[in-house]
A protein has these predicted regions:
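Catalytic cores of RNA-modifying enzymes
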Residues: 1-101
């Protein structure tokens, strides 16, 4: 999967899936390539750990968590995002998405 912090990759992914941001959900996705690895590192997550993420968006932080934790469970309320996450997280068998509010 190409880098999820590349604006061109993000734009193409969102357009392909017909996704537009929801103001009602207050959606803002992290795209700074240096932030997510630092967040995952600061959380101290490593082998033997699990991670629970609320609001994975397109999976930028999720990807970093999956690289470190044994299991990652992400909870998403936007019913439009699972197809995007299925694509962006396809390489990670330690990822599980829960669609719930």
């Amino acid at each position: 999967m190409p880098t999820l912090t590349d604006p061109a990759v993000i734009k193409e992914l969102l357009q392909r899936h017909g996704f537009s941001f929801s103001r009602a959900l207050g959606q803002n996705f992290i795209i700074n390539p240096g932030i997510c690895p630092r967040i995952a590192e600061a959380a101290g997550i490593g082998p033997g750990w699990g991670a629970l993420e609320v609001g994975p968006g397109i999976g930028v932080l999720t990807e970093q968590l999956c690289k470190r934790a044994d299991n990652v469970v992400s909870i998403e309320v936007d019913k439009r995002l699972p197809p995007l996450l299925e694509e962006t997280m396809a390489d990670y068998d330690n990822f599980k998405l829960v669609l719930n509010d």
